[in-house]
Amino acid sequence: ASRRHEFEFQISDYKWTYHTRIDYCLKDLVGQLEQLKKHAPNHTQVLCLGHKNNFRYAIYPRYKSNRRGIRKAAGYGALREWLANNYESVILPNVEADDALGLMAGPDDLIYSKDKDLRTIKGVHMESNGELTEVTELEANRNFYKQVLTGDSCDGYPGCPNVGVNAKFFDSDDWLKCYTEIDFWQLVQGQYLLATKKLFDRHQVTDPLKFALQMARVARILRPGEYDHENDKPVLWDGPS
């Protein structure tokens, strides 16, 4: 919203700056939230906001490195503060908004996010038009392990070489016959081992299985029980048991 209503402004012959119409932004945001409320009148809205610190940077230092140096829109901080003060909201130390949502999502909740990564969380997901889609545990797991393989160029982590989003591998019997997390994880590890040479050539990776775990921890949207509230930190994913 802040980017949509940001304008260049000339303050002198040689000086330009940016300004944002916060009132326009608030109108947009409140309108969107009210529309969502109409779609789910029997639910209480809880906004999940990201914390300033992010545990993923310690796991993979190049995480979101492609976004560093990109200026946030003018007024972004003020809008965020206004939302936190005027709506029921949750911020958990050291994790992103997606993680807070994934941790809180229960069987009676509706999940709303435009981020495809949330499809790794089981539950009922709502679209902006009110349409509801249920993501089963199997679908959530399949989406997660697929993300571990494909990586995410927007978030700056590479995944496994030659396994893109549209790779034929995801239509193979090996993939489609996976039902347990152990099945998925063993198959994912196998793909990373097959890519040993390319991983070294492209990323100087000497331990493909360690790198696979690194990618999984970065890709993992935290689920219920995967956060240590006493110490304000996530419980790092360590593979299926």
Where in the sequence are the language-model features?
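Non-catalytic, usually N-terminal nucleic-acid engagement modules in DNA/RNA processing proteins
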Residues: 1-44, 50, 57
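Extended two-metal-dependent nuclease catalytic cores across DNA- and RNA-processing enzymes
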Residues: 12-16, 24, 40-43, 65-240
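A short beta-strand-to-loop transition that corresponds to the Sensor-1 phosphate-sensing loop
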Residues: 48-52, 113-116
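Short catalytic/ligand-binding loop motif for oxyanion handling, primarily in non-cytosolic enzymes
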Residues: 53-59, 119-121
